[in-house]
Every structure is written in structure tokens, then in C-alpha cells.
Amino acid sequence: MRLFIALPVLIVVVAMTLEGPAPAQAAPDLSGTLESIPDKLKEFGNTLEDKARAAIEHIKQKEILTKTRAWFSEAFGKVKEKLKTTFS
């Protein structure tokens, strides 16, 4: 009984294996892939730009980050003034 079930299953598996990949699984055409690369790179660049702009806006709007930025600007100004007076 097991042989009657196993043999057709084995035949189906071998037939599927020898048939090759389905059209959706087949390797894509190289020229089609090369043609789509610029579009994908442009899309990636636009997405990256949007995310970077959103992150910068988010940083600008945070209160603690605004205070930190002001403190760094003030400290940099003091160091700049100190160097200016020292080397003048």
C-alpha cells in the first residue's frame, strides 16, 4: 500500500524538478535588470532624501536639542573668541 502512494508522489516530484523553475521564479532578463537600476536608485535617493529631511526637521523641533545646539554654538563662539584674542 505504501508503495502505491509513494511511487506517484515520487513521479510528481521528479516531474516538477525536471520541469524547471516557474516563469515567476526564472532568472530575470539582464537587460531588464540593468534598465531598472537607474529608476530604483532614483527612488532610493528620493526616499533617503525625504527621511533625512524629516529627521532634520524632527531634530530642529525638539526643545532639548535646540538648547543643546544653542549651547554648542555659544561654546564654539567662546572658543573662537579666545583663539582670536590669543593669536591676535
From Swiss-Prot:
InterPro entries: ApoC-1_sf, ApoC-I
Signal is among the record's keywords: yes
Domain of life: Eukaryota
Main location: secreted
Tissues where the protein occurs: Adult and fetal liver.
GO CC entries: endoplasmic reticulum; extracellular region; high-density lipoprotein particle; very-low-density lipoprotein particle
Position of the signal peptide: 1-26
Disulfide-linked positions: none
UniProt KW keywords: Lipid transport, Secreted, Signal, Transport, VLDL
GO MF annotations in UniProt: fatty acid binding; phospholipase inhibitor activity
Subcellular location(s) of the protein: Secreted
Keyword Hydrolase: no
GO BP terms, alphabetized: cholesterol efflux; cholesterol metabolic process; chylomicron remnant clearance; lipoprotein metabolic process; negative regulation of cholesterol transport; negative regulation of fatty acid biosynthetic process; negative regulation of phosphatidylcholine catabolic process; negative regulation of receptor-mediated endocytosis
Family: Belongs to the apolipoprotein C1 family.
PANTHER family reported for this sequence: APOLIPOPROTEIN C-I
Function: Inhibitor of lipoprotein binding to the low density lipoprotein (LDL) receptor, LDL receptor-related protein, and very low density lipoprotein (VLDL) receptor. Associates with high density lipoproteins (HDL) and the triacylglycerol-rich lipoproteins in the plasma and makes up about 10% of the protein of the VLDL and 2% of that of HDL. Appears to interfere directly with fatty acid uptake and is also the major plasma inhibitor of cholesteryl ester transfer protein (CETP).
Protein name from the UniProt record: Apolipoprotein C-I
Lineage of producing organism: Eukaryota, Metazoa, Chordata, Craniata, Vertebrata
Gene this chain is encoded by: Apoc1
